[in-house]
């Protein structure tokens, strides 16, 4: 190879990576799933010492999750995205006592969640029950954007009409695009076929 070509090629090999990395942006993602209304965490409440950490066997709990989110946002200079992958309802007495008030969604918003999707247990009360939950949450205050991308509504049955109307109102969206620190972030949520409660779930 001629020396006249070596110098330009070496020069380009040095500056091109710098140009590429100059446009690099960092994003921190905090993700949760299957929280099932377990506000108090796991372990007897008598073991819980809220003013210290590492002094008890209690794990989880929404207050601790909120603390992690708050501290992470404070520590990081880059944008922080907070999402939940579903099953935030059901599983504890808290939900059963006030199951259609859906204060879980309002708490998630207060904790700093940007978006959530629906898991199979959000459908435990059937489409009509989920529609009432989402409507109640929306009417009671701000909630994270709910994203659900593979909903298919029946054209023969009216049992899912209320939930379909929720989608039409935009309470649940098929996808979401957010901007954080110059980044455009696309979010969508999927529920697998294996989550179908019927015998024909694999069809």
Place the predicted regions along the sequence by residue.
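Positively charged n-region of N-terminal signal peptides that target proteins for export
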Residues: 1-5
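Acidic, metal/ion-coordinating pockets
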Residues: 21-203
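Short amphipathic alpha-helical "recognition" segments used for binding
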Residues: 6-7, 22
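Bacterial N-terminal signal peptides
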Residues: 7-17
């Amino acid at each position: 190879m001629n020396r006249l070509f070596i110098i330009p090629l070496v020069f380009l090999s040095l500056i091109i990576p710098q140009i590429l990395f100059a446009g690099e942006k960092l994003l921190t993602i905090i993700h949760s799933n299957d929280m099932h209304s377990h506000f108090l965490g796991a372990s007897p409440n008598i073991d819980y010492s809220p003013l210290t950490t590492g002094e008890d066997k209690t794990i989880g709990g929404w207050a601790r999750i909120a603390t992690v989110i708050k501290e992470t946002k404070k520590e990081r200079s880059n944008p922080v995205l907070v999402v939940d992958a579903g099953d935030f309802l059901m599983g504890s007495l808290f939900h059963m006592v006030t199951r259609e008030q859906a204060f879980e969604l309002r708490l998630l918003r207060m904790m700093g969640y940007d978006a959530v999707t629906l898991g199979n247990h959000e459908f435990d009360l059937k489409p009509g029950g989920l529609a009432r939950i989402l409507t109640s949450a929306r009417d009671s205050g701000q909630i994270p954007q709910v994203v659900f991308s593979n909903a298919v509504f029946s054209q023969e049955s009216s049992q899912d009409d209320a939930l379909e109307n929720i989608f039409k109102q935009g309470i649940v969206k098929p996808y979401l695009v957010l901007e954080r620190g110059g980044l455009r972030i696309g979010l969508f949520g999927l529920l697998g076929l294996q989550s179908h409660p019927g015998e024909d779930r694999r069809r």
